[in-house]
Amino acid sequence: LIIQNKDNDLIVACKNRFGNLLEIFIKVKNSKGLFLKLAKTLEKSGLEIIDANIFSSNDEKLASNTFIAKFSHHDRSFSQNELKELSLRIIKNFKSFGESSSTYNNGKKKLKFQNKTSITNSLNSEKGRNLITIETSDRPGLLSDIAKVFYENNLSIFSARINTLGDKVEDTFELENYNKKIISNNKMKKIIESLKKVVWRNC
């Protein structure tokens, strides 16, 4: 296990999981657009996200994020030096992130067969949050494109669960407005339409 920036606001830990998969833990101060920033950072670092758990502290000041990812350049396990280099690269890309940051192209081919796309929404009235589940075909940059939709609509991601099974993804997000008010039906319809454009982009 390689841990960088133990005493700083940004903590990154990387370790080999199994085969060519890596487990990446990132603890950082919560901020607007954080999930978009993390997704773009990992893509720029040459990583493809396979699985993820995103959680915010109860006061929403801190975010603890665990990603399972694979490196696009090779299919072997990382050496300790490579894990250290990767951790430092993630920190560097995170700190240098900006709106002009380009998405890393991992060369993944467009899928020949498309999975059925489904976007469902439900409201947890007790917590005042919406739960959106997206099932669709995977493609490079999909997760950051989804995160961008949420960011552009001033939504905060309280928690998220990302699952990739072969060429299919099933992503669930617990969302709320930044102003803590319940997302209106009209706004949710707009968000779902934007998500449809994103997930159908490569169909």
Task: Report the location of each language-model feature.
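Regulatory modules associated with amino-acid/nitrogen control
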Residues: 1-203
